[in-house]
Amino acid sequence: MNLRNSIAIVTGGASGLGEATVRYFVGLGARVAVLDLQEGQGAALADEFPGRVKYIRTDVCDEAQVQAAIDQTLETFGAVHVAVSCAGIVEGSKVVGKSNGVFGPHPLDLFSKVIQVNLIGTFNIMRLAAFAMQWNTPNEEGERGVIINTSSVAAFDGQIGQTAYAASKGAIASMTLPAARDLASFGIRVMAIAPGIFETPMLAGLPEEVRESLGKQVPFPSRLGRPVEFARLAASIVENPMLNGEVIRLDGAIRMAPK
């Protein structure tokens, strides 16, 4: 599918990997709806690209809000061809250990929160975007849409304290193939990207020496990943019709140590 003149929705599109994807897609001629809770950053991005980017405040876990966001995208741009899910949270806690200074079992509400945002939020976007995509006129390949979800290397190399996060990202990886099979008859592809350690707002608060140390753990290139590299891969997935039902590690060959 050619990104030029395509319509995409990007969750978590106001910052980090999502923002880079929005900017890259717009540069290739797409129009993009940014679904995010960060109103200031989302609105600023839309102001930067008038007529090309629309910001819609959206909680990806809320069925009604996501459906309303898709409806607004359809009203504004006329279709949804691509959906990229970048919205997510990172929370750490051991199965048994200290949480908020108290020794005990992993807080169940914390585990549920991570699963709700990362997994259920991603699935919510996928199912509702796919329903909108199946009405699209197919291209010459019979293709109607592309869905790209964000997993993580933690799905495969989860570290100490990452049980909830790894579970959420592992589930995203696991549902990629069956979702692709489910949607094949509609001409909709499903892929996932599993990023390694990237320069994102989540790492921005760390001291420079800590970020450099993290980058040196990557075999090659020995640095943190750049958000635009995620965006380039997302664009390549959209434009290559044979990429379907697979999880691509984007990590410089890193394999995470236990801690």
Labelled PLM ranges:
Residues 2, 226-250, 255:
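C-terminal substrate-recognition "lid" of short-chain dehydrogenase/reductases
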Residues 2-33:
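Canonical Rossmann dinucleotide-binding motif of NAD(H)/NADP(H)-dependent dehydrogenases/reductases
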Residues 39-40, 57-69:
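The beta1-alpha1 cofactor-binding region of Rossmann-like NAD(H)/NADP(H)-dependent oxidoreductases
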Residues 131, 180-182:
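Alpha-helical segment proximal to the catalytic Tyr-Lys
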Residues 152:
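Residue(s) in the substrate-gating loop at a strand-loop-helix junction
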Residues 184, 189, 243-246:
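Short, small/polar-rich loop/turn modules that mediate ligand/substrate recognition or access, typified
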